[in-house]
Amino acid sequence: MAERTTAAVKRRRRPRVVRQHSAGGLVVRGGEVLLIATAGGARWQLPKGRLEEGETPRDAAVREVREETGVTGNVVAPLPGIDYWFAEGARKRIRKHVDYFLLDYVSGSEVDFDSREVSTARWFPWDEALARLTHANERRVVASARRLVEGEVAP
C-alpha cells in the first residue's frame, strides 16, 4: 500500500510537458541581418513565434518576421532548427521546436511595427549580430545562414 501511495505522489508532482512548434526567420539585407530586442533591449534574438492553426512553418516564419519587425521577406532556404526546454511555473515544462528560414529583404522598416513582445528591431553586420545574440543555439543558426549566403554550402 505504501508503494502505491509513494508512486501516486511522485506522479502528481511531475510537471506537465507541453510541446510547442514555432518558426522564425533571419532576414538578410546586403551584408546585414535583422535582430529583435526583448526585455527592454537586454536580450537580442531572431524573430519567431508559434504556428497558427493550419499554418506551415515557412508561412509562420514570414508572418512572425513581419509582425515583430515590420519587415517583409521572401524565403530563400530552410536553416537548421533548434530545440529547447523552459518552464512556466512549477507545474509546466515546455519542449519547444523552432524551424528557421533564411529570408531575403523585400520591404518595410524596422521602426514600422506594433509588437508588445519586441522592444526594438535593428540591422547588424554579420559579426556584430553574432556577438549580440543572447542564445548560443541562435548563433549557430546565424552562422549557418552566413555560410549559405557567402556560398560555402549549397541550399
Where are these regions (language model features)?
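NUDIX/MutT-family hydrolases
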Residues: 100, 111-143
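Short, charged, intrinsically disordered terminal tails
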Residues: 146-155
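Conserved hydrophobic/aromatic beta-strand scaffold that supports enzyme active sites
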Residues: 26, 35, 100-102, 123
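Conserved Nudix-box catalytic region and its N-terminal flanking loop in Nudix hydrolases
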Residues: 28-74
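Active-site segment of metal-dependent pyrophosphate-handling enzymes
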Residues: 70-109
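N-terminal strand-loop-strand
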Residues: 2-46
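Short aromatic/basic micro-patch
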Residues: 45, 95, 123
